[in-house]
Amino acid sequence: SQIPLYYLDMIWHLPDRTNVFREEFDMQLQEILAKDRWIIDGNYLRTMEARIAACDTIFLLDYPVELCLEGVEERIGKPRTDMPWVETEFDEEFRQWILDFPEEQLPKIYELLEKYSGRGKEIMIFRKREEAEEFLQGREER
């Protein structure tokens, strides 16, 4: 794709495993949102509404918790383009965040999607990796 891709984790996290200040994160995000075209990867519920308001297409990966946990396990020890360090173990705080996600985060995300549905936004929800992969494969074939 010729559309620039931004990972929110790369903006928020620093290589020394600390974070940027919230104001710095927000400033960088606003600079991205001001561009004509972009793809943003990441949850960050605090800034989600601004991103939804500014975009034309939303992809929600509403995967089962078990699949999310497996995905994190598989990535341990591997370099990633979306993180500024290599995870050496499963962070327990992150594990708990994943376990709590369906009750604490997901309802708020669906509320935002409902709020913005019918406003010219294309909203795509994938519940299995295969669904997302099929969609992306179909885009590549065009």
Task: Describe every region a protein language model picked out.
Residues 100-142:
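NTP-dependent small-molecule kinase module
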Residues 1-4:
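A conserved segment at the C-terminal end of the G1
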Residues 6-58, 63:
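Conserved nucleotide-sensing/catalytic segment adjacent to the nucleotide-binding pocket
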Residues 15-19, 67-74, 134-136:
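Short, charged, surface-exposed secondary-structure boundary motifs
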Residues 46-47, 67, 104, 131:
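Short alpha-helical
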Residues 22, 26, 91, 102-110:
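A structural signal for well-ordered alpha-helical scaffolds and beta->alpha junctions
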Residues 63-105:
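A glycine- and Lys/Arg-enriched "phosphate-lid" helix/loop adjacent to the NTP-binding pocket
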